[in-house]
Amino acid sequence: MFFKFLPFFLLYLNGLCAQVEYSLEEKVGQLFMISFHGNEVTEELEEIIDRVHIGGVIYFNFLNGELSRSQVERLSHQIQSFRGIPRWIAVDQEGGRVQRLTKGFSKIPEASFWKCMSPNAIVAMGELIGKELKEGGISINFSPVVDLTNLNSNLLHSRTISSSADEVIAIAKSLLFGFRHEGLIGVIKHFPGHGAVNEDSHKEVPVTEKKFSLLLKEDLAPFICLSQHVDAIMTAHMIVKDFDPKFMVSFSQKWNAFIRNDMNFSGLIFTDSLVMDAVQKEYESLETAAICAIEAGADVLLFGGESPVGSKKTLPLPRIEAIHKTLTEKAKKDPVFLKRIEESFSRNLYFKNKRGIFPSAQLCQTSFAE
């Protein structure tokens, strides 16, 4: 398995960046994934992609409209046509009420129904989702949700597979197998599990009193098991008082160390969206939140979705540029922060190469055994 070769992986990352000289601005920009308005690339978006060296974009139906399959393909082609490192293109194509692309795309049943399907049917569904998204130029699906069903809350409910960790693991593994067969990256979310809380992080900071020992047996079990089958994990904006009572998971060095060391995970760590109210209530600015997330160990900062909740507006593109400038200036003055930027930049490049997003001719010819 790939994760057994961590020391060689780190050497590879160092060699990877030695082949091509990248500016600090490019390195910082690769950690940004943004959303935007409209079904075409505007001049403003093109300028931001160019100046900030954006690492990825995410599509939303409430921002980009009801895109047909041909429109998705054209938009993705436009985004990838600009100079610089090719970008991640992502979507939340979970199924049920969270299926961002519907026009011409197969209808995906909500996750709570999946336990009624056979393993082969789950794999086939994963392959179909993967095929349709890849044809549209999409490389990442923020799915499956592997939070356990919380029977006392309607927060995620139909978006979750089951209240049984074993059932979640088996079904999610089949879906991820289907994704991977089609070359689509699946992202398991929302680590360590919203099933342990009742509050909505879009609006406030969820806090759980659940003991860490119980989390290990229940909510964390799917993440620990499935981490060996995925390239990426998304962290949640929630506090587990028994593990790190001070910081939300996305901003917790202790939680990120658990992912890297205890779970032996060397893939990408995505934050949940930093425009959520839980983040904006805890941090004085998005600049501060972004710095804290990177210092904690995040590889990709997600600036996607509604801000504030219910407004159907995403973060203005000039704000993205301002945040990028702040992070770049900090990296120039802080060697420790610069090292974190370079680690996450290298990890992004490695996985873009591994999954065929980044042209291999631009990288060193080092092969990597999985």
Tell what function each PLM region has.
Residues M1-F8:
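Sec-dependent signal peptide recognition
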Residues Y12-G15:
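N-terminal signal peptide c-region/cleavage motif recognized by signal peptidases
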Residues A18-D50, S250, D262, Q280-E370:
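Preference for extracellular/luminal or secreted protein segments
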Residues F32, G183-G186, N264-L274:
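Short beta-strand/loop segments at the ligand-binding rim of alpha/beta enzyme cores
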Residues E40-E46, K217-I224, N256:
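Alpha-helical scaffolding within the catalytic cores
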Residues L45-E46, G130, A172, L176, ...:
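Generic hydrophobic/aromatic pocket-lining and core-packing "Φ" positions
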Residues D50-A170, H190, G195-E209, A236-F251, ...:
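Enzymes and membrane/adaptor proteins characterized by extended Gly/Ser/Thr/Asp/Glu-rich
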Residues F179-I188, K211-A232:
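Phosphate/pyrophosphate-binding betaalpha-module
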